[in-house]
Amino acid sequence: MATAIRLLGRRVSSWRLRPSPSPLAVPRRAHSILPVDDDINGLNEEQKQLRHTISKFLQENLAPKAQEIDQTNDFKNLREFWKQLGSLGVLGITAPVQYGGSGLGYLEHVLVMEEISRASGAVGLSYGAHSNLCVNQIVRNGNEAQKEKYLPKLISGEFIGALAMSEPNAGSDVVSMKLKAEKKGDHYVLNGNKFWITNGPDADILVVYAKTDLTAVPASRGITAFIVEKGMPGFSTSKKLDKLGMRGSNTCELVFEDCKVPAANVLSQESKGVYVLMSGLDLERLVLAGGPLGIMQAVLDHTIPYLHVREAFGQKIGQFQLMQGKMADMYTRLMASRQYVYNVAKACDEGHIIPKDCAGVILYAAECATQVALDGIQCLGGNGYINDFPMGRFLRDAKLYEIGAGTSEVRRLVIGRAFNADFR
């Protein structure tokens, strides 16, 4: 832990994002960063310091640009910002120190995911795809040569990482994927495509799942995971997608046309990709659950102060009982979600990884985040409905978490089937 704090305390350069243009005439006090009571959250002193350090950096360097990133669907300083995150030691937060990582646990990973998402939901999603879906998969499943080759640059921020699992006709039914990998000598030839890939347009390194045995029964036994590098012959990306939310977190289709991938880039073993995939999904759901937490906190950061500045009928609208009820509902949804996520993260750090609870935390937090965002819009009234204010962005970003990393419906199936299995 001491190593992590040292890494997180590295000097950050003086680069600063330019503040976004002022919205409509809004009272200065209509937005503030509300304090988070981490005594209630059960964090130790080092975890509290982690939140403080990363939050201060993000509120100064990312939050002022979040609205512009959303409006333009572009983060112009992404590469430079990524190196800043690398300097803070958070891109490889669960990776061993020997590869440049911070050697921390999943609770710390959730905390960073939460605070980045609080500043910008889109950048938070890109962070999760890089640090968990790519870096953590290589940490958990890569051999020594792969770790030494890829992790240092991913962790420093020189490289951006991604994971490619979904296809146009293989989302929730991921084992029906059609991307084919044929062994030819010392390499594999990949043909097919992947879709909805977060960080796809920007990624230098991607963990890609493909079928090496199309006749395997069950089909899951024929899946193999590969490490693919940008620039490998036959690999290309299509134009980035124009999304409802998470704008600026670039997403695209990946195209493989006789793409040659060295056999040395097989992650784990041939036809063992489903184990890499499924074990990774549990931790993906856990870490990404930090995203809805951050969005909910951002809604409160904007809504609570607004209710105590805006006046109607001769008093602050936060004094009306209906608005007090809204504040209570938003706060308790956030706190209940936070406790569930943090406790599951602590259990995972102790080696107690339960799929139904990894599915449960993102199911509950995601649906709460959507409702909290809706409540925030209602509290701001007409201002909540115009794009000069960030409330619409919070709603659009929150909705992604009911769809990505397995839909809410699939998460309910995971939980229900777990209980059914207990009674076989």
Swiss-Prot record:
Gene3D superfamilies (UniProt xref): Acyl-CoA dehydrogenase/oxidase, N-terminal domain, Butyryl-CoA Dehydrogenase, subunit A, domain 2, Butyryl-CoA Dehydrogenase, subunit A, domain 3
Keyword Acetylation attributed: yes
GO biological process, one term: branched-chain amino acid catabolic process
Biochemical pathway: Amino-acid degradation; L-leucine degradation; (S)-3-hydroxy-3-methylglutaryl-CoA from 3-isovaleryl-CoA: step 1/3
Binding site for FAD: 163-172, 196-198, 310, 321, 378-382, 407-409
Alphabetically ordered keywords of this record: Acetylation, FAD, Flavoprotein, Mitochondrion, Oxidoreductase, Transit peptide
This protein's name: Isovaleryl-CoA dehydrogenase, mitochondrial
Localization terms from the record: Mitochondrion matrix
N6-acetyllysine sites (modified residues): K56, K65, K76, K239, K260
Protein's UniProt keywords contain Cell membrane: no
Modified residues (N6-succinyllysine): K56, K65, K76, K260, K316
Active-site residue list: E284 (proton acceptor)
Post-translational modification (record): Acetylation of Lys-76 is observed in liver mitochondria from fasted mice but not from fed mice.
Enzyme Commission designation: 1.3.8.4, 1.3.8.1
Similarity section: Belongs to the acyl-CoA dehydrogenase family.
Binding site for substrate: S172, S220, R221, Y275, D282, L283, E284, R285, A405, G406
Record organism: Mus musculus
A Pfam family per the record: Acyl-CoA_dh_1
CDD domains cross-referenced by the UniProt entry: IVD (cd01156)
Gene Ontology CC terms: mitochondrial matrix; mitochondrial membrane; mitochondrion; nucleoplasm
Self-association state and partner proteins as the record states: Homotetramer.
Cofactor(s) demanded: FAD
